[in-house]
Amino acid sequence: MKRFEYFDVTADIGFTAYGNTLEEAFENAGLAIFNIISDTSGVNSKIVRSFEISSPDEVALLYDYLEELLFLHEVDFMLFSDFDVDISRSDDGYSLMATIKGEAIDWDRHERKSEIKAITFHMMDVKKTEHYELRAIVDL
């Protein structure tokens, strides 16, 4: 199964991330985001960041997760290439704990692709068939 694929949206880019589990699909969504910004195959897993978020449903959880990744990228000036996600469900909704690994951006070494301005809710979806599919669009 492919990890993710992109689709065209006017002035934006969308992606569908896949996984056998919800966690794996979220990890692949993180990889998809950072492959829009740079080629993650050249990003070393030197620095570790962890965060936890809670959201009322799976779609809101996906949005909040992607927003947090973008926030850490912008504030810490980092690229990430390794994602470990744990998701739990309760009566209040969903909780996500993520450990992500990457390194400080070095544009002399890292390929600069596109700048992500924002994560959007437009067409965002979490779907379970024989596997999980997460769909999101980012504003470039």
Question: What are the language-model segments listed below?
Answer:
Residues 2-140:
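N-terminal intrinsically disordered, cationic/polar leader segments
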